[in-house]
């Protein structure tokens, strides 16, 4: 004859400048990565119980008046008041102060029934309420003993017992929901129902799991404290009932049909060896042996007034073994739960049993959506870990915002994450705190929640960048520039004090690798020319964080103040972007140009031909007219005989009325051609590109000299060259 057992390893302003052709990005501030998120790991509180008592198997934060308590279950602890009882278990009330004290809660006369190994403290729950409601503590292996005269022997029926404590943690009232005077047979009906292996309290309901009902088919027992009536929920799907399903292994309640109704949850992790959850709908896991339904949590993830559902499958196996999963179901209304397209997996670590426990933490990060904690108590060779997930408008983030282990707390803990509790603000800073049990090290830890700072940032840019308008001067040169204004607004629900923000502004994020950056920050002392890429938008990015802020006012007389954290918005990590465009004066979306090119050869003495040896220089005057929309990135290609070599652009031809030379840059050349980049934007105007070419005969070879505007570059010297013939040319360069 077996019993169900839960034990064991199972604001600022910045100016950026655009020179008519320049680019450089400068990082302003080094941003440090954010530390641990909502839960503070530096000032954790640890509580220890008797050795080998499994102290921490269940935990519960509780508050009554001005007093905050950590209630801890130690299901195999010995009783100091009844030394003859073997390992009955105990409930400890720990005062959360600088000097913690433990008190053992008395369970009353009912303990006089056989309480050996009853596992008092296997489950704990609290009635909701700001000032703390009743507490329920259960011992699912408590046995009802009766003597059969007919058989001449005692019979022990593991009915299970729960104790309901007042909010001052006194005057326990026993509840034995499975006791029946006529019950005599172990396993049959409620003879071994093991009530209380799990429990959950609402304002009016006491919900207890009884997985041993009817040969471990299981049931969920609901006691209405207002009417005094008891209801029993079995699996009413007659075709699906199977012995050993363990319905009631986990229980809960939520608002699934409507915000004004309460529906009860019951998990059956052994249903067909796959697992099942049954509120007003049925969820069945297809993974064999996953223990789907061994933990359940009803929580309104998307803040729509209806409860969504998280179901743990801690023995689900992925690549290795028993990594564990949590299934997510989003309420579509009227208890129509749609499973999300992903599962929560933690670190997907070997034998972690992620999903063993799930707890609703309330809104830790002030974004309006509840957050949850998931325990993986066997991760890292039974050391354990706890993962924090944040609720979102669409449901829940699939990635945890925080991972907490015993080592990150500086403590040697084992089975950390076996139990979780929240719902109470122990330090009066306006945020609910979290308790975590680690029963293999007989410990429990309380983690306080850090206050949240909400920062809204914006980047203001001009709508367009007009290259014709030079609003700034750089090195006494008119320069095209734009102002980038970064603004921050800061708000906190609880924190009061100065906030030290640091931010990093990056420009031109979308620049193409084949082009240089187009912008630089004022004062760099670096300039370029020829901005060629004017089609790609100019994108700016601001990432920000806060320096560690010293808090001067404690949140209570007992606890040191906690440093605030920045709220992490969904979709990005404190990063915003904005972009602007280069202005294009086009009548249509796609510019329609009308480029007309003419060229005239200017020979010495106005001759019609040029005889080799009759002179050293000839000129080619090119005229380019655009009578349509603005042309962007125009290029001019000139080809000439091999014995003529390009020298430079003459500046004397640039004052001919309205004729304007925007800029000329050689970006490629061959022995018989040059390729000029005229300008990034060629508007409705003429361009004269005058190119003198001087044949310089040097022992039948040529001196090759390439000149573009005022930039001179000696490209190559063919064989041996007589430089005397090039002296005049070199002098005027």
Regions picked out by a protein language model, each given a short descriptive name:
Residues 3-687, 696-700, 704-710, 716, ...:
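Conserved beta-strand/short-helix segments
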